[in-house]
Amino acid sequence: GIVLCTARMNRIISCDEEEMSVLVQPGVTLMELNEYLAERGLRYTPDPGEKTATIGGNAATNAGGPNAFKCGSTRDNVLSVRAVLPSGEVVQLGCDVRKCNDGYNLMQLLLGSEGTLAVITELKLKLCPAVKAQMGFILPFDSLESCLSAAGRLANSGLSPETLEFMDDDMIAFSSS
């Protein structure tokens, strides 16, 4: 096997605030990207738990996090990628615009493939305005079934929560220790 480190491919190449997109190399960490975007009143919505994870790693695993309920996983927030195929060919996949309906979406196949199909060298990501205010709730449920039922009703209610996170007794005990 081959181990490839993209840690030095860590540049934020450009940010288009009007188009609400950012072009990054795969070694940029989620924390670095979020700090950069916060200064511009923007944010990248996928929010997996590990803030030192790289954007390339998030793309390779199609990471999501609690915000995936409303904002989607990494796959839903990548406009385009540049990648190197095993043959050495460099390909540009996806579109540089938010709506793109032409042909097969090979980029979607690449995202989540864990590096088995290509090496990602650049990603153009969708951005959103930074959140001005937030509110959180912790709701206890007697059973998994009642929790899932409430989540389904919430999803169909017309309300639009950005984050839903399920924690069972073991996870609560672990996070409390």
Describe each model-derived feature in a short phrase.
Residues 162-177:
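Terminal amphipathic helices with adjacent charged low-complexity linkers/tails
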Residues 1-4:
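Glycine-rich loop at the start of a catalytic domain that most often binds anionic cofactors/ligands
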